[in-house]
Amino acid sequence: MIKTIKYSKDVDLERELARSQFSYDDVNETVESILKDVKARGDKALIEYTEKFDGVKLENLEVTEEEIQKAFDTIDKDLMEVIQYSHDNIKKFHEKQVRNDFLIRQENGVVLGQVVNPIEKVGLYVPGGTAAYPSTVLMNAVPAKIAGCDEIIMVTPPTADGTILSSILVAAKISGVDRIFKVGGAQSIAALSYGTETIPKVYKIGGPGNIYVAMAKKMVYGEVSIDMIAGPSEVLIIADESADSVHTAADLLSQAEHDKLAACILVTTSQRLADEVAIEVEKQLKELPREEIARTSIETQGRIIVVENMDEAVFVSNFVAPEHLELAVDNPFELLPRIKNAGSIFMGHNTPEPLGDYLAGPNHTLPTSGTAKFSSPLSVDDFIKKSSFIYYSKQGLEEVKDKVIKFAENEGLTAHARSVSKRFEK
């Protein structure tokens, strides 16, 4: 049964809402060994690990054009239509995030500005094997393509027969992925970080994965950039008397089925709703194929918090800083300005979180574990870098030379001062 708490200032939210985290201790040594091995032996190591972990011995790591064409020929046409629809929505949303160069001209001949450039080579990890997550392909590849990355490399584990599922290949092609490789796990992160005979080294790696992939991303950070280290999934629902208990329970369980560590929290001003949702969660749990996973999540990470008013509800939500926040209230737009910490916000009674997972348009790669207090969803910004530039005319430099020299001398950097003063010696 999901635990219900009556909120007061005496409630220790830190303790009551402590979220479980993946434990990396058991995989550190294994991941470090894999990274070193791939760095040293390249493709040979990748082929061996693919046989060991995925049960298939590959002759070629790269997906061919023939395989991609076969995917288009064999994919369920309704699914292809859904993938295209999702792609178009994601593209439309992320195009609004594009940043432009800017220029500032001053009368004394000084020109200042910023130029925006895409990260030239990016690598995307997509979970694979028997699991198909074309939405992950779209959410990572589309913003990279819009950013203008020269080369988008995708890695994903093969199935037991050495192929990649059609939905993954179709989503990749539609999104503009340039090359796809049949390799997963920590070994694929190593390949993207160091490069092999076949797989090029990239400058940034994005995409979710299991604990081995997450640990590998942590270890290679600095050699390359990474998007984020995602923790278990989470949802917090703020609900008032107008919320439907059946829908609210279903929304909690849509996250609970992800992972035994997923956090599912309802914050409500209605004791009636709290009681009904607790009963409804138990009822719906029995109807789920992934009941065991969802039940563990609900019983260990699930909470219903009853508050006196919306001020308390907002306080709890901002404290938690959830990955997904649902505002199951009559006037969500009135509440929105008060929400300071959330990855993605789902407004009103007809906006269940899975809309954001698949096709609404905003990115579903979101900060977890409270990091929404200082982090943002994946966006075009993650695939660009900005350079500032400075141009001073002789007149412009002369006007500020004494100030620069004064600053440099104050900091004890004589050579800094001389690099300016030397330009005015006769």
Model-assigned labels for residue ranges:
Residues 150-160, 264-270, 348:
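Short internal beta-strands
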Residues 176-254, 258-263:
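Conserved NAD(P)+-binding/catalytic subdomain of aldehyde/semialdehyde dehydrogenases
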Residues 104-170:
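Conserved small-residue-rich beta-alpha loop and adjacent elements
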Residues 1-120:
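N-terminal Rossmann-like NAD(P)+-binding subdomain of aldehyde/semialdehyde dehydrogenases
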Residues 2-8, 179-184, 304-309:
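Short acidic-hydrophobic, aromatic-tinged amphipathic segments that line or gate anion-handling sites
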Residues 228-300, 304:
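A conserved active-site cap/scaffold subdomain adjacent to cofactor or substrate pockets
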Residues 318-426:
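C-terminal core of ALDH-fold dehydrogenases
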